[in-house]
Amino acid sequence: MSEIFDAKAFLKTVTSQPGVYRMYDAGGTVIYVGKAKDLKKRLSSYFRSNLASRKTEALVAQIQHIDVTVTHTETEALLLEHNYIKLYQPRYNVLLRDDKSYPFIFLSGDTHPRLAMHRGAKHAKGEYFGPFPNGYAVRETLALLQKIFPIRQCENSVYRNRSRPCLQYQIGRCLGPCVAGLVSEEEYAQQVEYVRLFLSGKDDQVLTQLIARMEKASQDLAFEEAARIRDQIQAVRRVTERQFVSNAGDDLDVIGVAFDAGMACVHVLFIRQGKVLGSRSYFPKVPGGTELGEVVETFVGQFYLQGSQMRTLPGEILLDFNLSDKTLLADSLSELAGRRIHVQTKPRGDRARYLKLARTNAATALITKLSQQSTITQRLTALAAVLKLPAIKRMECFDISHTMGEQTVASCVVFDANGPLRAEYRRYNIAGITPGDDYAAMNQVLRRRYGKAIEESKIPDVILIDGGKGQLAQAKAVFAELDVPWDKHHPLLLGVAKGADRKAGLETLFFEPEGEGFSLPPDSPALHVIQHIRDESHDHAIGGHRKKRAKVKNTSTLETIEGVGPKRRQMLLKYMGGLQGLRNASVEEIAKVPGISQGLAEKIFWSLKH
């Protein structure tokens, strides 16, 4: 029992109603959140002499204070518990690391509907199909749909400003509804209906309608039309032949679990209309001593009861582990969805086959993850030995990217004991410096990153500075001047200079800006982890710089031409079919645009050419 917490006095004040409790340590940090049907009974169990696990013993030893929130029902307690877990991220709770909303395919409600990927709240008028496991699955499906059913995927701003068709029309990936006369309203509406049926899992209806149209076209001697429809039929069949489809045609999520060496993998199959849309593996953060039942129960609750997950509920959830609160979970999900949600643990037939697939995928993903973690752990241990540190729990690396001093972007990437922590990667737009001054850029990003209060768990053990002695000197100067509440001497600053011809394995490392550096053998695990984080930082910086450069390039060209305001820009883009069409136009063609004189056309022409 905690020596700094009077459990007896506290328990006298606790009610026997349902609710949620939050446990705090001496620093005022929430270390655990839990729910209970009977708060008094549940909280009393923490302060018995014979505790169930070492994890609970370690938790209780750190309790300084407990807050209790009483709720009307168990369902309210369950929802509030997961909201608090998401808010506080307590270290003794099982935590779902990835809380992104899932993407959908969106079919807009416009006169000429468009297909697009959508995340977040569903405010726009139209139909939503999904969810898909990730953005890649959506983009792959959109590319496939574009080949089979050529309806538009362009933004409305582009669609409304076209006077001639784009490249997608030329290569047969769009029917060109933006230009009058290219496609009839009936034909476009028919293709949209095919997409709607296809995404709803009604492939047979699509094929039946296409075959009927092909036969009619043949009877009418419209052989080119019949051949085009035949190609559509073949494309649809090729897609459906590759897909295992359940005869039931239901919407369900299938959750398989694997647990080994203190690490858990939860694999989710997303099945809609009987089709597997995709799958995804999750590796929740599991405190030591946690039982598998708690991992599954907490994961399922967080997965469906936090934020956007509530809008993607299927009709049925299959689990390969029996939950103690299965009925409570099903009732809570049903209440949220406004319809009955079933939670099953012993399926048969196709459902059993799906569950076996999810379980196998979870086991395979866990084996791969453990292997990767073993490699990362070995590398971090080797680097800690080289740097004479007891351990490395967190590393951060910085890099600068620009083109001739323009659009400068700094990147910060983060590694923890499991490798890249991509959710904490950051980019910083650098401004107010002399173009091309990498030292000033590094100085600015380090001040912005570290010149403020930082949680103790997020103070890095090692900070890598990509660039060698000069950049390391800037980092040392920044840290010498910092006035912060955390120990600014704790992070070890390490400069990394690229080798001759930037060849991997020839890097030189520096502890101090003055004096000689040192190198590690090319086969050193310590060097490999340095190369890994350095390359991640480099790629992250370049990616941000390219996006910034592309944005400037695409928006500033016309804006810099004197005499071309917003209305003339819009008119030019509309009549020329976009910026590329305008670049390819002659002076005479530009002069034909309403409101553009011969002199202004020449100015526009030469500005775009040079």
UniProtKB/Swiss-Prot annotation:
Species the sequence originates in: Salmonella agona (strain SL483)
Protein name (record): UvrABC system protein C
Annotated ranges, domain GIY-YIG: 16-94
Gene Ontology CC terms, in alphabetical order: cytoplasm; excinuclease repair complex
Cytoplasm listed as a keyword: yes
Subunit and interaction comment: Interacts with UvrB in an incision complex.
Gene3D superfamilies: 5' to 3' exonuclease, C-terminal subdomain, GIY-YIG endonuclease, UVR domain, UvrC, RNAse H endonuclease domain
Pfam families hit by this protein: GIY-YIG, HHH_5, UVR, UvrC_RNaseH, UvrC_RNaseH_dom
GO molecular function: DNA binding; excinuclease ABC activity
Family: Belongs to the UvrC family.
SMART domains assigned to the protein according to its UniProt record, in alphabetical order: GIYc, HhH1
Native organism taxonomy: Bacteria, Pseudomonadati, Pseudomonadota, Gammaproteobacteria, Enterobacterales
Domain of life: Bacteria
Subcellular location(s) per record: Cytoplasm
Function comment: The UvrABC repair system catalyzes the recognition and processing of DNA lesions. UvrC both incises the 5' and 3' sides of the lesion. The N-terminal half is responsible for the 3' incision and the C-terminal half is responsible for the 5' incision.
Main location: cytoplasm
GO biological process: nucleotide-excision repair; SOS response
Coiled coil (residue ranges): none
Alphabetically ordered keywords of this record: Cytoplasm, DNA damage, DNA excision, DNA repair, Excision nuclease, SOS response
Residues annotated as domain UVR: 204-239
